[in-house]
């Protein structure tokens, strides 16, 4: 520990999650071969699909590289068989690739990049994603938008 390391919170009633002596703040990440830290999301965003852990952000990142997608958000929705499943809300681009975009094309793209349990069952197309004042997607507003 050095003089710049955080040792706790100012609220004495706040319960700390400690892992190996470190304070866990809920961020998920990994250290690459060059010792760079990559933050990939939040632990509370993780969903379980048929017993497998899936981080929706990984699906979002894969789809952000897909031709025809202007912007996209992946998240978990309840499922009676697998407890949860991946759903995707996509805003197509205005070009030919966006006009040709289909739910099956999105599923196929994810299937070639990630494990089967990460393939979205639900695909919704929107004109725009609902965002808050800081520009973050508001997931609770997505469930009532789009068509599968």
Regions of interest found by a model, annotated:
Residues 1-11:
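Adenylate-forming AMP-binding core of the ANL superfamily, especially NRPS adenylation
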Residues 1-2, 50, 125:
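A secondary-structure boundary/capping signal
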Residues 8, 18-21, 26-118, 128, ...:
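AMP-binding/adenylate-forming catalytic core of the ANL superfamily
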Residues 11-12, 138:
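Short, solvent-exposed helix-helix connector turns and helix-capping sites enriched
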Residues 51, 135-136:
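Conserved phosphate-binding and hydrolysis motifs of nucleotide-dependent enzymes
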Residues 123-134:
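Short proline/glycine- and acidic-rich turn/helix-capping motifs at secondary-structure junctions
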Residues 136-148:
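Phosphopantetheine-dependent thiolation modules in NRPS/PKS and related acyl-activating systems
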């Amino acid at each position: 520990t050095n003089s710049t390391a955080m040792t706790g919170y100012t609220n004495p009633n706040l319960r700390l999650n400690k892992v190996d002596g470190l304070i866990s703040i809920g961020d998920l990440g990994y250290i690459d071969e060059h010792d760079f830290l990559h933050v990939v999301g939040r632990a509370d965003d993780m969903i379980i699909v048929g017993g497998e852990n899936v981080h929706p952000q990984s699906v979002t990142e894969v789809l952000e590289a897909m031709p025809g997608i202007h912007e996209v958000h992946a998240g978990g929705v309840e499922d009676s068989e697998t407890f949860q499943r991946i759903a995707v809300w996509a805003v197509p681009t205005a070009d030919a690739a966006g006009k040709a975009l289909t739910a099956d094309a999105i599923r196929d793209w994810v299937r070639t990049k990630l494990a089967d349990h990460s393939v979205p069952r639900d695909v919704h197309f929107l004109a725009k994603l609902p965002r808050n004042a800081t520009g973050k997607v508001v997931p609770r507003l997505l469930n009532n938008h789009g068509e599968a």
